[in-house]
Amino acid sequence: MEDGHSKTVDEVLSHFRVDPERGLSLDQVKEYQKKYGPNELPAEEGKTLWQLVLEQFDDLLVKILLLAAIISFVLALFEEHEGVEAFVEPFVILLILIANAVVGVWQERNAESAIEALKEYEPEMGKVIRGDKSGVQKIRAKEIVPGDVVEVSVGDKIPADIRLIKIYSTTIRIDQSILTGESVSVIKHTDAVPDPRAVNQDKKNILFSGTNVAAGKARGVVIGTGLNTAIGKIRTEMSETEEIKTPLQQKLDEFGEQLSKVISLICVAVWAINIGHFNDPAHGGSWIKGAVYYFKIAVALAVAAIPEGLPAVITTCLALGTRRMAKKNAIVRSLPSVETLGCTSVICSDKTGTLTTNQMSVSRMFIFEKIEGNDSSFTEFEISGSTYEPIGEVTLNGQRIKAADYETLHELGTICIMCNDSAIDFNETKKVFEKVGEATETALIVLAEKLNPFNVAKQGLDRRSSAICVRQEIETKWKKEFTLEFSRDRKSMSSYCTPLKASKLGNGPKLFCKGAPEGVLERCTHARVGSTKVPLTQTLKQRILDLTRTYGTGRDTLRCLALATADSPMKPDDMDLNDSTKFYTYEVNLTFVGVVGMLDPPRKEVQDSIVRCRAAGIRVIVITGDNKATAEAICRRIGVFGEDEDTTGKSYSGREFDDLSVSEQREACSRARLFSRVEPAHKSKIVEFLQSMNEISAMTGDGVNDAPALKKAEIGIAMGSGTAVAKSAAEMVLADDNFSSIVAAVEEGRAIYNNMKQFIRYLISSNIGEVVSIFLTAALGLPEALIPVQLLWVNLVTDGLPATALGFNPPDLDIMTKPPRKADEGLISGWLFFRYMAIGGYVGCATVGGAAWWFMFSETGPQLSYWQLTHHLSCLGGGEEFKGIDCKIFNDPHPMTMALSVLVTIEMLNAMNSLSENQSLVQMPPWCNIWLIASMCLSFALHFVILYVDVLSTVFQVTPLDGNEWMTVMKFSLPVVLLDEILKFVARRISDGESYIKNMHGLVLAWAVFFAYIIWGP
């Protein structure tokens, strides 16, 4: 039933043709079951394991690697002279692909749990009244249908969306925090809410499915079941939300596509260039064998071009980032989101508990100082402290005072304790104080403990004992006999108390009362001034209300309660405690004591975090279910708005936002800083508008209602104290629910992205070097310098360790003073690509040069001519050109070892270069990152292991090198440092706006030094 909240009880009953005393007949139940279906949320239709596994292989780079593995395996099967070593390459490639697939499947499985977590809010049983049986009967909740008359009482979980028709207790309170985020339980009533557009918070006559009864007993008619409930609509919205890839994932996908196209072109080119060599004598004159040989080289090229270690290094770097974030109370559930935090441009933050402490606290109060006729003055106190721990100072005009010196405060403290059903409790695990009961009542308990009006000695007491000693003292003086519960009509509650011993308040019973100032003052005839009782005139009442209104508006927007006492209350025997409508007549002839103003105070560190966000170019939007005035007041206190800033066009209520056209809503989202009185649908809509403007949004939330928006936003941030559904839908969980932890996580995300750029640059330049080396050997007709299994070793192990260590680079000092990078900013800019090509080109040439040096110049080598080397495949055919040369020399492992050693050494030096994108090694030396030095040492150690351990040297087809050969390796390797220093020098000068000609002078000079080193070096 739509708009059930706006219909009267009779209209709802007639709509379902139901008698509130007898319930539905069995025929009606069957009819409605057929019409509306079962009262349950359908299970999520998840993907099968095989679907998830196959999805992991739906990537161009992965497909190319898989194809390379299959081809290598097939070629190894048909190879005549190869042993088990031939299968190492396809086996290692498959191992990499399987490992990546396992990680991918695990992450997807993790993400699917959000919708399933909703089912925990479905109750198993419900209490209904039906025509087949008299009285209340328990049935399975899934069998409940719209029109059923349901009864609920304290502790029950609401089985469906229910329209209240009758309340049996004084009041009925519902804890609907999971759905609306309201921290205080809500009092419900049976009256119609005439607004058809009312938000869930304003539907005071509806009990929502999955929420809990905090107090009272009532009966209602079911108006929505299954997917037609408020929680069901959230489930529908979540299932319709598509997963969006993070900016990094999108860039890596684009990079993969570009790389795969380049790989395909180069592989075809290498194969085509060598068509003329297919029938060389080395292939036995067989054109097919020659074609297969060069096909193997093309496969090796594909393996060389793909950075197999990149996924593992990225995962490791992100995992390290999550550990650092966890230390800052930000627990990351989805690894890719770590990097996304770095480009967050908008943070949409909940107010309650994130920007504020979610611990109501009395900050101001006033009592009468004097009354002379209609002339009067107030004493106004301020109270410090923003948590439930009763530590804080009571000040008057900035000076600390003793509450014991003010007799009125004796009575005020007593009312706070005795007219109260709540308490504070010390959580031994978390080492914090928590509320037991209502937030507003807990604030009064804490106030009384801070006041300590009876000067109770607290020295030597532990934290728990010192926090309850005032309460214990007051409870030795007074005994609570009964409570007149809060009701909507009088907006107050009171406690009938009798004295246990003589006190300044008198020897007779008292009725201590608290409530809305307007309602309490109506029933006040006197006011307390010190220990005297003075008549309260209408003029004085107006003055109290005026000051109360000042507390409730402006910068503070405090929630005010008036405290009063009935000095001579009616006798209990004359009261009818079962009829709440008569409570109003018992709370009469009250004496006004004072007014306390409380608020959910902002966290101390939030204001500084807002300033940091502004400096970092991040817009903070506060989204809350609170009313507009309260929300704006808090926003002014924390710096989202200036003290006197006009909020027109920057602050919208949910209703105001709905009244705008689509284009106006989009415009509002582009400049707004506050949305108040919002529903879950508003949050999702705001995220959609921000995404359409290419903003990267982080959205916070804690309730079930927040889950769709958390899932839709690029970064969903759930509160540690939030619901399981919110945590499952989010990418990150704040252990301390603190906004400042989000800012710390954003800073970490930016640092991680900078480090990722460095190791991606490092790995890609290495791969370009490998491609260049294979391309050169194939194009020039040189013997193989590197084979696939060696390339895999370099890509995965030798390069992987320093690349991972680059993730430990310290963040730049100015990282939070730069604007967020754009989501569509390329991973590789034009200048970076040129640097990759320059470094990669040198790596490839040096690698091939190392192998060629052994053939042409080494004392232990054959000392061939360049022509002989480039025509080595003709050696087996004989001829004068190869007279006296043993053709087996072309299978010697020395040249491959030289090439591999040059490649590894250059890559270690290149890792050193990657410490900073533009800073020289003189400014940022290697010991800035001790992990990098350790990883370089380990990589060299592993390289020596495969060279000097016989079993491994056979697998990798390498051999030990002598001192002269190692000296040559260093000669080929060291220039890469000089080359990168030149490129960094140019980058710095260009970014500083220096003259291009000056740059060219420096560049020419540096290149001259470089070539002099190559030609005349040792």
From Swiss-Prot:
Membrane-traversing stretches: 49-69, 89-109, 253-272, 295-312, 757-776, 787-807, 828-850, 897-916, 930-948, 964-984
Annotated Ca(2+) 1 binding sites: 767, 770, 798-799, 907
Membrane topology summary: Multi-pass membrane protein
CDD domains: P-type_ATPase_SERCA (cd02083)
Binding-site list for Mg(2+): 702, 706
Any one cellular-component term (Gene Ontology): sarcoplasmic reticulum membrane
SMART domains cross-referenced by the UniProt entry: Cation_ATPase_N
Keywords: ATP-binding, Calcium, Calcium transport, Endoplasmic reticulum, Ion transport, Magnesium, Membrane, Metal-binding, Nucleotide-binding, Phosphoprotein, Sarcoplasmic reticulum, Translocase, Transmembrane, Transmembrane helix, Transport
InterPro entries for this protein: ATPase_P-typ_cation-transptr_C (IPR006068), ATPase_P-typ_cation-transptr_N (IPR004014), ATPase_P-typ_cyto_dom_N (IPR023299), ATPase_P-typ_P_site (IPR018303), ATPase_P-typ_TM_dom_sf (IPR023298), ATPase_P-typ_transduc_dom_A_sf (IPR008250), HAD-like_sf (IPR036412), HAD_sf (IPR023214)
Cytoplasmic side: 1-48, 110-252, 313-756, 808-827, 917-929, 985-1018
Binding site for Ca(2+) 2: 303-304, 306, 308, 795, 799
This enzyme's EC code(s): 7.2.2.10
Gene Ontology terms, MF aspect: ATP binding; ATP hydrolysis activity; metal ion binding; P-type calcium transporter activity
Gene3D superfamilies linked to this entry: Calcium-transporting ATPase, cytoplasmic domain N (3.40.1110.10), Calcium-transporting ATPase, cytoplasmic transduction domain A (2.70.150.10), Calcium-transporting ATPase, transmembrane domain (1.20.1110.10), HAD superfamily/HAD-like (3.40.50.1000)
Matches recorded under Pfam families: Cation_ATPase, Cation_ATPase_C, Cation_ATPase_N, E1-E2_ATPase, Hydrolase
Cellular compartment(s): Endoplasmic reticulum membrane; Sarcoplasmic reticulum membrane
Active-site residues, record numbering mapped to chain: 350 (4-aspartylphosphate intermediate)
Lumenal side: 70-88, 273-294, 777-786, 851-896, 949-963
Catalytic activity: Ca(2+)(in) + ATP + H2O = Ca(2+)(out) + ADP + phosphate + H(+)
Family the UniProt entry places it in: Belongs to the cation transport ATPase (P-type) (TC 3.A.3) family.
Function: This magnesium-dependent enzyme catalyzes the hydrolysis of ATP coupled with the transport of calcium.
Name of the protein this chain belongs to: Calcium-transporting ATPase sarcoplasmic/endoplasmic reticulum type
Originating species: Anopheles gambiae (African malaria mosquito)
Taxonomic lineage of the native organism: Eukaryota, Metazoa, Ecdysozoa, Arthropoda, Hexapoda
